From Swiss-Prot:
This is Protease ElaD. The keyword Hydrolase applies. Changing C313S: Abolishes deubiquitinating activity. Belongs to the peptidase C79 family. It comes from Escherichia coli (strain K12). NCBIfam families: PRK11836.1. The active site is at H231, C313 (nucleophile). Its EC number is 3.4.22.-. InterPro entries: ElaD/SseL-like_N, Papain-like_cys_pep_sf, Peptidase_C48_C. Protease that can act as an efficient and specific deubiquitinating enzyme in vitro. Does not possess desumoylating and deneddylating activities. The physiological substrate is unknown. The lineage of its organism: Bacteria, Pseudomonadati, Pseudomonadota, Gammaproteobacteria, Enterobacterales.
Length: 403
């Protein structure tokens, strides 16, 4: 990787900034580690060089960004002054890029990779947002940082607010990561409850689609994170053998971190599961699968966990799903209801301070996972562009699958 030398950001004019690609040097793993060591000793030039490298979209750019981010996110008494230098350098870069592009929010306005990482979801952007004093600008940056394609965020959403709701994309990133190698549990993509302008639900669409492609589905526990309208719940679906009559049965557990869900929403979920049970019996019959299904068992587990954490329903869904996934990997016979109930009971025994800390640590892990997704995507995009640039074939195809 070749990187531009840009130092003393506060002394650069816009013209000088555009000319900084004249002087370059090669980045190696050894150089990165050396810069990290000297940066931690308080060397300002090393900190600025790490920022230069972090602006890149290859693996060294991501690693340099991770170094800076880790220092900022894990403060100690010895690193407080270094963190101040890192934040100052980040903010200077952002302000220079803002002036150069005349827009702090639209990365496509500039073809220059020097700026793009400062206007898209990245760890550098989270450091910048910490330092920006204006709430209105933090809110504008939040729209970009959270990549709000689903228009979930209100105008007042602040990414740096420790008590905000998690978005669909953040929840999906985290759950996809923890379920990547799970053999006994499958996590489905988070959705809203109702299909817009319809009485149908996304859940029934997903269930019916699965049994039409495989009448024996589900063969493992299925987890569905669902937003009921400003509130996340976790639906667990499992096909079990009823011990009383030795017949198959659909068992559904709805995990809710509040004390109640509401009559209409509960009825909608009951209707969906009962309808799915009928559809499943029909598909099995059509495919000559001669198995009788009992009536489904539907359990609402209202855990009442949000006494101190009013906006943490998304975090609770992630933690609950992680509990089910990890415990079932250890013991595939573990029942989701038992796991979720035990998880909720344990959490309620913690003090308010301990609950805040658990929530904070989870949100930090969730944030890292979300930002890493975009970091990895940027690296892949960078190398794909290099491959296209240096290859001859004119016709290329690519595909993307979200599982």
């Amino acid at each position: 990787m070749m990187v531009t030398v840009v130092s003393n950001y506060c002394q650069l004019s816009q013209t000088q900034l555009s000319q900084t690609f004249a002087e370059k040097f090669t980045v190696t793993e050894e150089l990165l580690q050396s810069l990290k060591k000297t940066a931690l000793s308080g060397d300002e030039e090393s900190i600025e060089l790490l920022h230069n490298i972090a602006l890149g979209y290859d693996k060294f750019g991501k690693e340099a960004e991770d170094i800076l981010y880790h220092i900022v996110r894990t403060p100690t008494n010895e690193t407080l002054s270094i963190i101040r230098l890192i934040k100052n350098a980040c903010l200077k870069l952002y302000n220079l890029a803002h002036i150069a592009t005349n827009s702090p929010l639209k990365s496509h306005d500039s073809d220059d990779l020097l700026f793009k990482k400062l206007f898209s979801p990245s760890k550098l952007m989270t450091i910048i947002g910490d330092e920006i004093p204006l709430i209105s600008e933090k809110q504008s940056l939040s729209k970009v940082l959270l990549n709000d394609e689903n228009n979930e965020l209100s105008d007042g959403t602040n990414f740096w607010d420790k008590n905000r709701q998690l978005t669909t994309d953040e929840i999906a990133c985290y759950l996809q990561k923890i379920a990547a190698n799970a053999k006994n549990t499958q996590v489905n993509y988070p959705t809203g409850l109702y299909v817009p302008y319809s009485t149908r639900t996304h859940l029934e669409d997903a269930l019916n689609e699965n049994i039409k492609s495989d009448p024996s589905w589900p063969n493992e526990v299925q987890l569905f994170p669902i937003n009921t309208g400003g509130h996340w719940i976790l639906v667990s679906l499992q096909k079990i053998v009823n011990k009383k009559n030795n017949k198959l049965q659909i068992k559904c557990v709805i995990f809710n971190s509040l004390r109640a869900l509401g009559y209409d929403k509960e009825n909608s979920l009951k209707r969906v599961i009962n309808s799915f049970n009928s559809e499943l019996m029909g598909e099995m019959s059509n495919n000559n699968i001669k198995v009788h299904l009992n009536e489904p068992e539907i359990i609402f587990l209202h855990a009442d966990l949000q006494q101190y954490l009013s906006q943490s329903c998304g975090a609770f869904v992630c933690m609950a799903a992680q509990e089910v996934i990890e415990q079932r990997e250890s013991n595939s016979d573990s029942a989701p209801y038992t796991l979720l109930k035990n998880h909720a009971d344990r959490f309620k025994k913690y003090s308010a301070e301990e609950q805040y800390e658990i929530d904070f640590q989870h949100r930090l892990a969730n944030r890292n996972c979300y930002l890493d997704k975009y970091g990895d995507a940027n690296i892949n995009h960078y190398y794909r562009n290099l491959e296209i640039k240096h290859s001859q074939p004119k016709n290329r195809a690519s595909g993307k699958r979200v599982s």
